[in-house]
Amino acid sequence: ANKIIRNAIDSKDKNTDNFREFTANFYSRGLFKVKEAPEKILGQSLGDLGGGLDSTRTGIIYLSETVSEITFQKKPRNFKEKIIASKVSGSDNGISFNRAEQANFDFYGNTVFVAESNLVSPISDVAFGYYTFILEGSFYDKNGRLINKVRVLPKRDNDRVFSGFIYIVEDDWAIYGIDLIAAGKQ
């Protein structure tokens, strides 16, 4: 796994240039999960947030899923999205995760800006200081390319990092996909 990640880090510039424009299918899921919510905030009762909290005052209070087709061009910047399906559960209070453009994250940089925090990319130049990598397996995509599935594990609990999986194309060392969640203290 370390060799795969090193190759992906070494190929970042090449792969960023190769993806000046693309079309892709996009799926996103966003949720707000609350742990141990207080009874009141600034003297105002929270209740059970519309039935989203259990007896320990923990629960998912908002869930949004979207499937869309996106087209992206880097220069000049152009982004188009056609939403195929969208489902929202809970009160959004004006907040929505239903747009792909809001999730336009660049993992080829050293950090990824998520929810007001810069998190260390798994293929950052300093990734090995923050992550442990484990090769979980490989598979061939429909174009016959070998895809490596690499588990991404934070080394420390308090770092602003991700946890999950990154998929890297063999020989090109490009990111094929990600399945990551923000981890650590944000």
Provide a role label for each language-model segment.
Residues 183-186:
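Short aromatic loop motif centered on NTY/YTY
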Residues 164-168:
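Hydrophobic/aromatic beta-strand elements that line small-molecule binding cavities or substrate pockets
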Residues 2-147, 152-161:
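Structured extracytoplasmic
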Residues 142, 170-171:
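Short, ordered coil/turn segments that flank beta-strands lining enzyme active or ligand-binding pockets
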Residues 174-175:
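Hydrophobic "anchor" residues
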